[in-house]
C-alpha cells in the first residue's frame, strides 16, 4: 500500500474512532502501524487523562462544569484535546442513545458525571452499560424512576429500556413492561452535600429496599422475584437485543 493510501486509511480511522487528528500527527501513527494504533485506541486506560487543572486555568469558576455553558465547553475541550479519542467518541455515542437533558434534569454537574460514566463504561459490555445507565441519577430523574414505587409503579424507565434501549417494539408485551417496572422499584436518587451553600446538590444512586416490589414477576418467559439487574440479565440474552 502506498504511503498516501496509508495516510488516508489512518485519517479515516481517526474520523470514525475519534474526531480526526492533525495532519502532522498522521505520519507518526502511520509509522507505528495500523494494527498497533487500533490496539492503542481500544485500550484508552494506557493513555493519560485530561488534567482538570487546565480547565481551572481557563475557567477560574469551573467547579466541575456547574452550569450549561461551562458544561458544554468542558466536553468540547475534552473531545479536542483527549489522548483517548475512542473513549470520548463512545461517550458521545452513548449520550446520543441514552439521551438526557438539562432542560428537565436541571443539574449540570450530574449530567457531566453521567458523561464521565459513559467514558468509563463505553467500551465494556452492553449489560454493564445498561446497569450503569439504570443507576445513573440523571437517567433516573429524566425517566421518572424516582417516582416508581411498590404499589404505584411508573412505567417510563421500563418502557424506554425495552422499546428504545434494547428489544424494540413487538418483542415484549405490556405485561413484560409492567413487570420490568416493578423490578426497578426502589431505584432512586439521593442528594449529597452541596459543593457550596449556593450550589446544586450532587446526586447519588440510592436503593430503597422498603420501596421495592418483592412479588413474583413474569418477564419474557421467565418467572421469579426479579430485581432490576436480573431484568437486564434477561434482556441481554434475547435475540432481539443488539450485540456490542
For each of these PLM feature ranges, what is it?
Residues 21-121:
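N-terminal accessory alpha/beta regions
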Residues 40-42, 56-57, 71-75, 107-244:
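Active-site substrate-binding loop specific to GH73 endo-beta-N-acetylglucosaminidase modules
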Residues 2-6, 10-23, 238, 242:
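Flexible, low-complexity segments enriched for small/polar residues
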Residues 4-8, 20, 31-35, 70, ...:
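Low-complexity, intrinsically disordered regions enriched in charged/polar residues
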Residues 7-17, 48-52, 63-66, 152-156, ...:
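Short, compositionally biased low-complexity segments
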Amino acid at each position: 500500500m502506498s504511503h498516501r493510501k496509508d495516510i488516508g486509511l489512518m485519517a479515516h480511522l481517526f474520523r470514525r474512532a475519534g474526531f480526526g487528528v492533525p495532519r502532522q500527527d498522521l505520519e507518526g501513527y502511520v509509522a507505528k502501524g495500523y494494527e498497533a494504533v487500533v490496539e492503542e485506541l481500544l485500550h484508552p486506560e494506557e493513555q493519560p487523562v485530561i488534567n482538570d487543572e487546565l480547565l481551572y486555568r481557563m475557567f477560574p469558576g469551573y467547579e466541575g462544569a456547574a452550569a450549561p455553558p461551562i458544561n458544554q465547553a468542558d466536553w468540547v475541550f475534552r473531545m479536542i484535546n483527549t489522548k483517548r479519542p475512542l473513549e470520548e467518541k463512545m461517550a458521545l455515542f452513548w449520550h446520543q442513545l441514552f439521551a438526557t437533558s438539562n432542560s428537565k434534569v436541571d443539574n449540570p454537574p450530574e449530567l457531566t458525571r453521567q458523561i464521565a460514566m459513559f467514558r468509563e463504561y463505553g467500551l465494556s459490555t452492553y449489560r454493564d452499560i445498561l446497569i450503569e445507565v439504570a443507576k445513573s441519577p440523571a437517567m433516573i430523574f429524566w425517566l421518572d424512576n424516582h417516582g416508581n414505587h411498590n404499589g404505584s409503579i411508573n412505567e417510563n424507565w421500563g418502557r424506554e429500556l425495552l422499546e428504545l434501549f434494547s428489544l424494540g417494539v413487538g418483542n415484549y408485551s405490556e405485561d413484560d413492561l409492567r413487570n420490568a417496572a416493578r423490578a426497578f422499584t426502589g431505584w432512586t436518587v439521593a442528594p449529597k452535600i452541596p459543593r457550596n451553600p449556593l450550589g446544586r446538590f450532587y446526586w447519588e444512586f440510592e436503593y430503597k429496599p422498603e420501596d421495592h416490589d418483592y412479588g413474583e414477576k413474569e418477564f419474557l418467559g421467565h418467572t421469579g422475584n426479579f430485581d432490576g439487574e436480573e431484568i437486564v440479565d434477561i434482556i441481554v440474552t434475547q435475540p432481539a437485543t443488539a450485540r456490542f
